A protein has these predicted regions:
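Conserved small-residue-rich beta-alpha loop and adjacent elements
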Residues: 428-503, 574
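Terminal low-complexity tails and localization/encapsulation signals of metabolic enzymes
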Residues: 205-207, 217-218, 222-354, 358-361, ...
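A structured beta-alpha segment of the ubiquitous adenosine-cofactor-binding alpha/beta core
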Residues: 439-441, 507-527
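Short beta->alpha connector loops at strand-helix junctions that form conserved
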Residues: 480-482, 510, 568-569
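Positively charged, amphipathic and often flexible ligand-engagement surfaces
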Residues: 9-283
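Single conserved hydrophobic/aromatic residue that forms the stacking wall/gate
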Residues: 1-8
């Protein structure tokens, strides 16, 4: 008999960012459970689970293998998913581990049960490529290659083949030749007819080859997700079990050789699953990576550290010769100085408004296509300097590492989105219907000068979104960052200037909100305001704009960022707990977006 616990059912904190805690808290628990299994002559197999957890689970398994309590025991095993592109290297690592610890490791080879999740997470994460094969034939070929590697593992690997596929059964038998030191596995309630026929025809038990039946054990809440995954797996159009039940499916197709199938496909990857960076139909997706991937995370952390080796400086437009500087402190440790800012005065704001007003016409006349090219170039520069921007998000704004990465990605997405809108709506005039003899067209143009006032909780993303939207529409911009986060905003403005936005079109005005606001809002040359913050402040801006003489100014306001969470009886408690923690510690629960 064999126990197969899922560590994630015990701890939702099973993530690489909490590596030290996992090794300190989870490993002793698993060692204790495995020791009990050893004493009861039971096997004990843990799961590598999703791709994001693979490196962490391999570290956990290595610690279990080295535990003194579990020595001289060949019952400690690991389940490996063949649909992961790292399955073969994982088996090679396990083989070396088994030899190093002089143990035979039971390896349960499965095809994988989280394919949809792996694809979706890779798309959301904007990673370079998918961690799993995108065609079923690719997974089937990988399974065969992994089986061959397991047989080649000698005394370091005890192969356990979990499958409900007749072709896979036949391949395993062929690869095994005369070997009998392995076993087949199936799930309770699945593959019974297949294995009945297999046992009648091939009589594996008589040759000493066992077939283990896996049965789920647990509460209804724990088993529900498992059962749903099994239904999705067996209900998939490409599933062997599902196709076998289809009387119209040709038998030759059902038992086709996956190697031949994959070789006949061009391209080998699924063309309907574009790479995460290319998945959007009309623009590039922002680039990201998984913090659970040490190969990506370690260089990013090192570059973040290097980028803040020297103090940062933000200078308001026109204040280059000003003397007064203000320190910017780390919100998580007020003793730590991140940099300095030279703030704008009301006089600086008025000079900037005059300069922007003169430059607005030429910027608008540039056309939507040219402005879009500049914004797209800026998005590329944001991604080039991603580590520096992330470091500022962490040190200046108090962001966690995942939210810092999300901050930069969202800013890049804003730039590319508004570039797309600029091309679509501001490049060419649109022909309108009209009476015979009339030629009616409509073209969109910038209003003039926009003030963009951003919040502290998304100091780069919302700041960039406001500025990019106004620039894309042909407006000159006076960019006012939150008083708490001028450094990251200054870095964004610097990259926009580097991308080609003229300095007299985009002005940077950090400083006291009411003082700068009073200098700008009463001036009729200000055509509009984009504001994210409190409802009270938005109402004050609205009243100030309405009270002045001159053209009516536009106000785009996003307000009221203190959210309530409503939880009903159908919610999963562990999901609620994760969401509550995220809400409490990301922006202290104050977000203007769900």
């Amino acid at each position: 008999r064999n126990l197969h616990p899922f560590p994630t059912r015990r701890s939702s904190d099973l993530e690489y960012a909490k590596h030290e805690r996992v090794m300190r808290e989870l490993v002793p628990t698993l060692i204790s459970l495995a020791a009990e299994a050893k004493a009861a002559y039971l096997g004990f197999t843990i799961d590598a689970e999703e791709a994001e957890r693979l490196d962490l689970m391999l570290d956990v398994f290595e610690a279990l293998s080295a535990a003194p309590e579990l020595q001289n025991w060949n019952g400690l095993g690991l389940a490996v998913q063949a649909y992961q592109k790292r399955a073969l290297p994982t088996l090679g690592w396990l083989t070396e581990l088994g030899r190093a610890h002089k143990r035979r490791i039971p390896v349960r080879l499965v095809k994988g049960a989280y394919w949809d999740t792996e694809i979706k997470r890779a798309q959301e994460g904007g990673v370079t490529d998918y961690p799993v094969f995108t065609r079923k034939a690719g997974t089937d070929v990988s399974y065969i290659a992994c089986a061959r590697a397991m047989f080649a593992g000698g005394d370091a690997i005890y192969p356990q083949f979990a499958t409900h596929n007749a072709h896979t059964l036949a391949v395993i038998e062929t690869l095994a030749a005369s070997r009998t030191d392995f076993e087949f596995q199936r799930l309770h309630g699945m593959g019974e007819a297949l294995y009945d026929v297999f046992h009648d025809l091939r009589k594996p038990a008589a040759r000493g080859i066992g077939t283990r039946v896996y049965a789920p054990v647990g509460s209804h809440e724990d088993l529900l997700a498992y059962l749903v995954r099994r239904l999705l797996e067996n209900g998939a159009n490409t599933s062997f079990v599902n196709r076998l039940a289809d009387e119209e499916a040709p038998i030759d197709d059902i038992v086709a050789d996956p190697v031949a199938t994959l070789s006949s496909l061009t391209p080998r990857r699924n063309p309907r699953l574009l790479l995460p960076h290319d998945m959007l139909p009309d623009r590039k997706n922002s680039q990201g990576f998984f913090w659970s991937d040490p190969a990506a995370a370690a260089p990013a952390l090192a570059e973040m550290k290097r980028s803040l080796a020297s103090s940062q400086l933000a200078i308001a437009s026109g204040a280059e010769n000003a003397r007064g500087v203000k320190s910017v402190l780390d919100p998580s440790d007020r003793r730590r100085k991140v940099g300095e800012v030279v703030e704008a005065t009301p006089e600086h704001a008025k000079v900037a408004l005059q300069s922007a007003h003169r430059a607005a016409h030429d910027w608008d006349a540039l056309g939507g296509d040219a402005r879009a090219t500049i914004l797209e170039r800026a998005a590329d520069l944001y991604e080039r300097d991603r580590a520096h921007l992330m470091a500022l998000a962490v040190r200046e704004a108090g962001k966690t590492l995942p939210t810092a990465l999300g901050e930069v990605r969202e800013a890049a997405d804003f730039l590319r989105y508004y570039a797309k809108r600029a091309r679509a709506e501001f490049q060419n005039a649109e022909q309108l219907p009209g009476p015979t003899g009339e030629d009616n067209k409509i073209s969109l143009h910038g209003r003039g000068v926009f003030a963009c006032i951003a919040p502290w909780n998304f100091p780069l993303a919302i700041f960039t979104g406001q500025v990019a939207g106004a620039l894309a529409a042909g407006n000159a911009v006076l960019a006012k960052p939150a008083e708490q986060t001028p450094l990251i905003a200054a870095a964004g403005v610097k990259l926009l200037h580097e991308a080609g936005v003229p300095e007299d079109v985009l002005h940077f005005l950090p400083g006291d909100g009411p003082a700068i606001g009073n200098a700008l809002l009463s001036d009729a040359r200000l055509a509009g305001v984009a504001f994210t913050g409190s409802t009270e402040a938005a109402n004050a801006i609205n009243r100030a704009l309405a009270a002045r003489d001159g053209p009516i100014a536009a106000l785009i306001a996003e307000t009221g960022g203190q959210n309530a969470m409503i939880v009903d009886s159908t919610a999963l408690p562990e999901q609620v707990a994760r969401d509550v923690l995220a809400s409490a510690f990301d922006s202290a629960g104050q977000r203007c977006s769900a």
